[in-house]
């Protein structure tokens, strides 16, 4: 488990909710994303396997406090196929009562495959709790980078879609993704990752994430301009800044008339002013070639310049001034 992931989990286990619904939502999510429910000889057993001992202790404590059901903690040491120890919360008595109380079976006894309906249609705090539980169970947060982001490994497609729905209720865009046979939910946008960390209750980690992200985004420009002998880099930086300024002007001119696919390319150019076209393509979701990015930006500027001409107002080139490019 990476340092940031561990930091998030250490912070989340200290989050306490006064709402019983939210506590149950978090527990249901943990069972769904880290648990297995098995029946043998007519007896149901739940095992929740976690990578953090403190999380396992929290889960056992919540089960006891919410439902007066005892849970046993079992530590699994490192193995040849697994270097890190695992911690299992085992419920052998009243397991059926537990899964019914958290909503993982319907009143008629049918198993719920994704998340319980009361979470999907519940309050914002329920959605936050579901994400908190999912991250404690199977979440990872990587350092800001080209493929950075927050992800949760999911037991099935239905669970991933349910988590995507919870993110949508929080105003965030998450995407289901299948990698090497494992279903995942991924959030790549840096601002969205920060917002979700705050929503879950990891406010300190959110500050660390934002600082790391800001340093990383500032570094490419500093690296490029440090070598003033490299005229190509300077020309590229000037062109990127000029294009970003023109795109901003274009978006103002076009207003709501901007097609979505052109708006996406324009927003990337504005948000990452010093990035190369190739870097913008990698930041797009889904990713694009640099030629595709360039083509969309070119069409956006052409549309805006044509509309400006029709309206009798200055076109996008008016914002490209010597003052704008003085630092390059």
From Swiss-Prot:
Keyword Glycoprotein found: no
InterPro entries membership: Homing_endonucl, Sporu_reg_WhiA_N_dom, Sporulation_regulator_WhiA, Sporulation_regulator_WhiA_C, WhiA_LAGLIDADG_dom
UniProt keyword annotations, A-Z: Cell cycle, Cell division, DNA-binding
Coiled-coil segments on the chain, per record: none
GO terms of molecular function: DNA binding
Single GO biological process annotation from the record: cell division
Ranges of the DNA-binding region feature: 276-309
Domain of life: Bacteria
HAMAP family in alphabetical order: HTH_type_WhiA
Protein family (similarity comment): Belongs to the WhiA family.
Function recorded in the entry: Involved in cell division and chromosome segregation.
UniProt name for this protein: Probable cell division protein WhiA
Annotated organism of origin: Corynebacterium diphtheriae (strain ATCC 700971 / NCTC 13129 / Biotype gravis)
């Amino acid at each position: 488990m990476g340092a940031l992931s561990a930091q998030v989990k250490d912070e989340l286990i200290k989050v306490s909710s006064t709402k019983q619904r939210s506590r149950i939502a978090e527990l249901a999510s943990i069972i769904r994303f880290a648990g297995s429910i098995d029946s043998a000889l007519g007896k149901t057993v739940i095992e929740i396997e976690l990578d953090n001992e403190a999380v396992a202790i929290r889960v056992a404590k919540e089960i006891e406090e919410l439902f007066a059901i005892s849970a046993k903690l079992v530590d699994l040491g490192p193995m040849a196929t697994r270097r890190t120890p695992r911690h299992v919360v085992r419920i052998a008595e009243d397991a059926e009562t537990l899964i019914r109380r958290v909503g993982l079976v319907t009143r008629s006894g049918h198993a719920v495959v994704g998340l319980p309906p009361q979470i999907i249609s519940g309050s914002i705090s329920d959605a936050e709790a579901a994400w908190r539980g999912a991250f404690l169970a199977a979440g990872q947060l990587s350092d800001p980078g080209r493929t950075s982001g927050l992800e949760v490994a999911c037991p099935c497609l239905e669970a991933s879609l349910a988590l995507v729905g919870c993110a949508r209720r929080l105003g965030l865009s998450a995407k289901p993704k299948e990698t090497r046979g494992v279903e995942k939910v991924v959030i790549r946008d840096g601002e969205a990752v920060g917002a979700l960390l705050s929503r879950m209750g990891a406010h300190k980690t959110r500050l660390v994430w934002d600082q790391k992200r800001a340093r990383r985004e500032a570094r490419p420009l500093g690296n490029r301009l440090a070598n003033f002998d490299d005229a190509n880099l300077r020309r590229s930086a000037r062109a990127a800044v000029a294009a970003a300024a023109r795109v901003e002007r274009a978006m103002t001119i076009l207003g709501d008339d901007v097609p979505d696919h052109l708006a996406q390319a324009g927003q990337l150019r504005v948000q990452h002013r010093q990035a190369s076209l190739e870097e913008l393509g990698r930041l797009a979701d889904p990713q694009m070639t640099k030629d595709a990015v360039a083509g969309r930006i070119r069409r956006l500027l052409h549309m805006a310049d044509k509309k400006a001409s029709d309206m009798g107002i200055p076109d996008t080139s008016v914002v490209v001034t010597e003052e704008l490019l003085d630092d390059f």
